[in-house]
Amino acid sequence: MKQPSATNLCFTGNSTVKQPTPFDIGFFLGILVGEGHFGGDGRQPQITLRMHTRHESLFRWIEARFPGGKLYGPYEHGGRRYYQWMARGAFLRTELMPLLDERLTPELDSKTFERFSAMKARYRL
């Protein structure tokens, strides 16, 4: 069995998850701003990303760099084939919220900022 290198070990000696690069973060947040939905199910907040199945490789990229969300599908509804990725719970609160709080401003995209702010207010984030 191949041993992990010293460059990808944390202090416990376990392999660490590769941290997203600044490009990864910016690209991912751009996708969320352009295609994401900020809301919830009435009980808990969630960020949802729904796109056509032709974007499967993009969803796999998201899964590899931002593990913690959940990918559903493919689905077919109304003649449309799509995947749906969702972020909820601890992953949303501890991983995505800080990224969005630090980077999403009304000057960048006022509509998305309003939706994000409404989600935070409704679910007391």
Residue ranges of predicted features:
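Internal intein/HINT superfamily modules and their associated LAGLIDADG
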Residues: 1-125
